[in-house]
Amino acid sequence: MNAALEKLSQTINGTVQLDPLSKALYATDASVYRKIPLGVAFPKDLNDLQRIIQFCNDHSVGLIPRTAGTSLAGQCVGDGLVVDVSKHFTEIISLDLEKKQVTVQPGVIRDELNDYLAPHGLFFGPNTSTANRCMIGGMVGNNSSGTTSIKYGVTREKIVSMKAVLWDGSTAEFKDLSSDAFKDKMLEASAEGQIYKGIYNLLSPLEIQSQITDAFPKKEIHRRNTGYAIDLLLEADILGGDAPFNMAHLLSGSEGTLALTTEITLQLDDLPPSYAAMVVTHYNSLEDCLKDVAPVMKCNLYTCEMMDKIILDCTKSNREQSENRKFVEGDPAAVLMLEVRAFSEEALQKNLLQLQNEIKTS
């Protein structure tokens, strides 16, 4: 296999690393899992991606897309060929200020994107704890959320469209499709056409739709990455719903198992209000903490995060984090961290008062 991979390296503009050190570095992500890959490919362009896919098809090799590798559950770990797009697919392609949309390649870092957007009064809302190094492609693959998901939603909800390379090396753009446009796609003899035909045949039977509706987590639960989001596809008008069909919603959260993404268009939000405050409520039991969540969520929060005693105790003996826990009073069983924001100091104080009153009466 090494000889074949070396030959592949000679046919692409990028590189394929086969040395033991490179394999060891890419054998894990930010998780505890470890598998030595066959090699690591660094494609430079679309043609490289297509050649890599053709190689994997010809040699029955698994393909593992990867960006920053900050995932915590082994999403980009495997014994196939790792395809790292973080090195060359790093361009912010375009910004549409009127539509408040930006198009990027998957290797763009989340915080660097927001640095670019800030002068325009815009930002990309989902904010993982690794926002200064995680990349948009990985956020799409994982359907990342972050602390402000209660206000700005998850990554899937921000995706307007995606361009991708499919299993046969052909390209496709996934975006909102009307019922008529969906039917036209089904008539195509391409790989993309096969996808739409397959989706329709799989999901159109009412019995299947009923099983999906009954078995999948409630849509009201924002952070619910439990496999392919086929339940969301049922909202499309072609399948009996009232929304356009968008395959990008299925790609988000699929962890790179369905296609290689080359471009992502995102819907942006206005920058959040600049006046902010954090209220930290302390509890003697985890149950009391959880009971307060529903009442305080009525107060237009930007963040609502819980830390229990296990996490709090871990920070006591950590040299770095012990400096960050000075707000903790006593030895609580749990705390809630509640962020409020406003466009003025006066409005902020009003929001704080509302939150404090809600806490007192809950």
Predicted regions and their residues:
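Glycine-rich, histidine-containing beta strand-loop boundary motifs that form or position
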Residues: 20, 65-69, 76, 106, ...
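Short, acidic, Ser/Thr-enriched surface-loop or helix-capping motifs
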Residues: 71, 97, 135, 166-167, ...
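Generic non-transmembrane alpha-helical segments
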Residues: 3-15, 51, 55-59, 116, ...
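Gly/Ser/Thr-rich beta-alpha loop segments that engage phosphate groups in nucleotides
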Residues: 69-76, 109, 136-143, 148, ...
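N-terminal glycine-rich flavin-associated loop
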Residues: 8, 25, 31-63, 81, ...
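N-terminal flexible segment immediately upstream of the FAD-binding catalytic core
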Residues: 1-54, 58, 68-100, 129, ...
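C-terminal substrate-binding/cap subdomain adjacent to the FAD-binding core in PCMH-type
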Residues: 31, 141, 149-152, 159-362
